[in-house]
Amino acid sequence: MAISLVTIIVMGLLLYHRFKLALEKTAVDNTEATVEGTVDRLNADLLDIRQIFNGANYNVVQQFDISSREFVEQFSLLYETNSDKVQSVALYDHEGKLIASEPVALEKKNVQVQTQEWYKNAENAIENVHFSTPHIQELFEDGAYRYQWVVSLSSYVDVNKGEIPETGVLLLDMKYSVIRDVMKQINDSSDGIYYYLSSQDGEMIYHPRGTELNRGLFKENSLEATKYENGTYEIRADGQNLSLIHISEPTRRVVI
């Protein structure tokens, strides 16, 4: 009788353990599906922005003389068509002087364009399109004194100016809301977990508790994600919290 009772207890524990593992696996699978879906949405939005940037470069900047009416019209049309995602688009010459911008706005005084990270990155690696981390746009005057959060795309480009070939830097500021809205949606529908997005260097791009992070009231070990290559992982951050990381590209990491 005692042996049978022990056997029943052991079998019960084994069944419970397997049931618990099955539940944990289901939870992880569901979480992976959510993360992968989020990554797909972010990639689609960022690919769209990249295509808008390429359109500005190849179909406008390199297609028309910057002094022509066609250039002005097409530059304006490109912005107006994509104003739901684009905060502004601007073209600068090799000395950092503004050639064109949409929407048309006054430059802020004492802004040293050539010292901006997006400008320096474009100059240092002329064949690449560079994505910045989120920041407040400080290039143009805003009559309503609003602070616009953006992610900047920049690249060194060829500029048509009469018979003289020149170079410059094309800047497209994507509205930060493009990323924020996707991340906010999955966080609003999550149950007891949260998702954040960081860069390849561990810099925070989006966090649902971003205000607390900025004030030092909350900490996040985003550097842990920089150790991993493309894929989905389970890790322990700070020796306690179980996290799942999905890396779609070397530049972005969605972390739970």
Describe these PLM feature segments:
Residues Y119-V129, E220-I235:
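Soluble sensory domains of the PAS superfamily and closely related sensory modules
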Residues E70-N82, V169-E212:
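Solvent-exposed, extracytoplasmic
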Residues I245-I256:
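Single conserved hydrophobic/aromatic residue that forms the stacking wall/gate
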Residues M1-L21, K25:
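Extreme N-terminal signal-anchor transmembrane helix of membrane signaling/transducer proteins, especially
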Residues A100-N110, F131, M204-E224:
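GAF sensory domains
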